[in-house]
Amino acid sequence: MDANECSNSENSATTTIPKSASPSTTISTKVVKLDEIGILISQGAEAKTYETDLYGLKCIVKERFSKAYRHPILDQKISSKRILQEVRSLNKCKKKGIQVPSLYLVDIGNNRIYMEFIKGETVKHYLYKNQESTQHQNQIESIMKELGNQIGIIHEMNVIHGDLTTSNMLLRESTNELVFIDFGLSYTSNSVEDKAVDLYVLERAFISTHPNSEQLFQTILSNYELTSSNSKIVIQKLNQVRLRGRKKTCFG
């Protein structure tokens, strides 16, 4: 599903009906307020995320909200551009075999993306529970290896996630598959610097939320090298980014 195919005009929405959905069940994406039909599950700086129902199927709706300080026309253009970029990133990953939420509907007029509801826990929560458990070490190592492999493939497509943290990775309950979520800050770039910064964001997330996780991140990097053709250059640049980060921490 190309981004242009799933975008809509201000007064309509293009729908992809999930196979398991009931065709007799409908909702109006034009008039429905999500806080009336859905459950707010998170709110960030750019968007709110709801759990709701689409054609009888549980789904997640991500709704970008307007910024009062921006001119309405400019605000809509920026929101539309970011939504379409997120959709493109998800589609690229899906076509390459990366586990990401399936897209159901994109409603540009209302700044919404309807996507697959994934039942599972975040990698962050999994590590909180099991990092110190000896019986889970093999599983944790397997997850870290998969993380490195998948990020390498994502970067090989020149997709920059923009917010690589263990909160934005899920373990699907039914299969334990690793699923990447929240591509709201993603963009396309072949820059070694951008890829290195993407990895640095993940490293800082490990340092700040998962104590004694240095070896875990090293496992990620080792497996990143297996799927990224320019991994050596990216990791060299990562070392430079780390140095800049330390200087900023020391001197402000």
Swiss-Prot record:
Active site (UniProt): D163 (proton acceptor)
GO CC annotation, single: nucleus
Major location (coarse): nucleus
A molecular function GO annotation: protein serine/threonine kinase activity
Subcellular location: Nucleus
Keyword flag Kinase: yes
Record-linked SUPFAM superfamilies: Protein kinase-like (PK-like)
Location of the region described as Disordered in the Swiss-Prot/TrEMBL record: 1-23
Residues given in the record as ATP binding sites: I41, S42, Q43, G44, A45, E46, A47, K48, T49, K62
Subunit composition and interactions: Component of the EKC/KEOPS complex; the whole complex dimerizes.
Job description of the protein: Component of the EKC/KEOPS complex that is required for the formation of a threonylcarbamoyl group on adenosine at position 37 (t(6)A37) in tRNAs that read codons beginning with adenine. The complex is probably involved in the transfer of the threonylcarbamoyl moiety of threonylcarbamoyl-AMP (TC-AMP) to the N6 group of A37. Bud32 has ATPase activity in the context of the EKC/KEOPS complex and likely plays a supporting role to the catalytic subunit osgep.
PANTHER family: EKC_KEOPS COMPLEX SUBUNIT TP53RK, NON-SPECIFIC SERINE/THREONINE PROTEIN KINASE
Protein's UniProt name: EKC/KEOPS complex subunit bud32
The organism of origin for this protein: Dictyostelium discoideum (Social amoeba)
Gene: bud32
